């Protein structure tokens, strides 16, 4: 199976003015309610499992339409209402001035004692972070579009030209460490893309192995190392590379419940960030490994690891990996018969298989045989 770029489905569309307009429209609504003597309020999409569902057609985990109304003239709501206005004003200033702030900086920048009272605007970051999430859901924009950033994690390597502000560079010519993915990728542009597909790799050690073996050059692909669970910035970057550049996405993780969950968040989104799935998830992504079938296919039985936790048929079980496996077996997005088979095999055998276990064959095996053969033969899970 030859992987080829497809026709782009989206265009680069970041526009700070759109974010400012949404903020201002919401602020004008509140002002008009105050002027007319009404009790001003915000309608906030409800968080929680009871307002999350799996859209079979879109293949995405989505937020439902339940709302909670937050009034100013309500003792139970007034504090959060005021905090929302404070952060809206702060975000407007950030976007207008073209500056960015971390979640921690946003908390400290807005923490102060209200004049004439002993009341602080925020007592802890655990108060400001949820308000920023509320604004994401209320405005329908990413916090990164509001210039609020998170810690950076992950890197890319391959023949793709990146434009980051005034800087323009090729991600295959920055040394073997590649380009570190920033917390915010909304402003990043791709003037030149010379790869056929994206290979998303869970561990930095495996990504480094593939780079050392010159896999990106030989197979003409872009390596994206997530370094564990993919950050929002990495997931957004993967989404953009697929939808704006038409690049197929192949995911390569450890063969365990954690690795498979990493894949599912890249593909379908996550329950916690269901309201952002349409901007972060990539439903067309495919999974190359590791799988339970790989253990038999490549004679890796002697390098498997035992699942962590207590099995369901033992006292106190299921816990750990076993508990996560059973949860995944019941997720709507893992109901495909191929995935059900893999999950049940893991549960039956009680083992997991790491990416690095392929080194038992040889250091070059993963780059010269395992990945090229599986991708060429189309041995990919949906």
Curated annotation (Swiss-Prot):
The gene is top6A. It is an enzyme of class 5 (isomerase). Its cofactor is Mg(2+). The keyword NAD does not apply. Pfam families: TOP6A-Spo11_Toprim, Topo_VI_alpha, TP6A_N. One of its GO terms (biological process) is DNA topological change. This is Type 2 DNA topoisomerase 6 subunit A. It comes from Pyrococcus abyssi (strain GE5 / Orsay). One of its GO terms (molecular function) is ATP binding. Coiled coil: none annotated. HAMAP family: Top6A. It catalyses: ATP-dependent breakage, passage and rejoining of double-stranded DNA.
């Amino acid at each position: 199976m030859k992987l080829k770029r497809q026709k782009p489905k989206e265009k680069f569309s970041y526009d700070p003015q759109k974010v400012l307009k949404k903020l201002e429209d919401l602020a004008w609504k509140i002002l008009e309610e105050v002027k007319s003597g009404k009790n001003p309020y915000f309608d906030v999409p409800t968080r929680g499992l009871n307002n999350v569902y799996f859209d079979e057609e879109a293949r995405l985990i989505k937020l439902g339409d339940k709302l909670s109304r937050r009034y100013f003239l309500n003792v139970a709501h007034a504090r959060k209402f005021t905090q929302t206005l404070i952060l809206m004003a702060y975000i407007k200033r950030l976007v207008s001035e073209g500056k960015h702030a971390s979640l921690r900086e946003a908390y400290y920048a807005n923490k102060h004692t209200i004049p004439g009272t002993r009341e602080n605007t925020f007592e802890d970051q655990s108060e400001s972070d949820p308000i920023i999430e509320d604004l994401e859901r209320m405005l329908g924009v990413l916090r990164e579009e509001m210039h609020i950033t998170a810690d950076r994690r992950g890197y890319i390597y391959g023949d793709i030209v990146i434009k980051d502000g005034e800087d323009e560079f090729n991600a295959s010519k920055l040394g073997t460490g590649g380009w570190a993915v920033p917390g915010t990728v909304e402003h990043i542009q791709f003037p030149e893309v010379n790869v056929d597909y994206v290979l998303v790799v869970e561990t930095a050690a495996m990504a480094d192995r593939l780079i050392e073996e010159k896999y990106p050059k030989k197979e003409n692909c872009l390596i994206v190392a997530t370094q564990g669970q993919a950050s929002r910035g990495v997931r957004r970057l993967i989404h953009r590379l697929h939808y704006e550049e038409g690049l197929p996405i192949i995911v390569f993780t450890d063969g365990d419940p954690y690795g498979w969950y990493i894949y599912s968040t890249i593909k379908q989104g996550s329950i916690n960030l269901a309201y952002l799935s349409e901007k972060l998830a990539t439903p067309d992504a495919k999974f190359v490994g590791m799988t339970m079938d790989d253990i038999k296919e490549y004679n890796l039985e002697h390098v498997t690891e035992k699942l962590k936790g207590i099995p369901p048929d033992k006292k106190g079980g299921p816990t750990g990996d076993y508990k996560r496996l059973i949860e995944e077996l019941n997720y709507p997005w893992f109901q495909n018969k191929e995935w059900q088979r893999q999950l049940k095999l893991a549960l039956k055998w009680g083992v997991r298989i790491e990416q690095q276990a392929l080194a038992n064959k040889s250091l070059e095996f993963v780059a010269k045989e395992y990945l090229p053969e599986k991708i060429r033969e189309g041995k990919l899970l949906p």
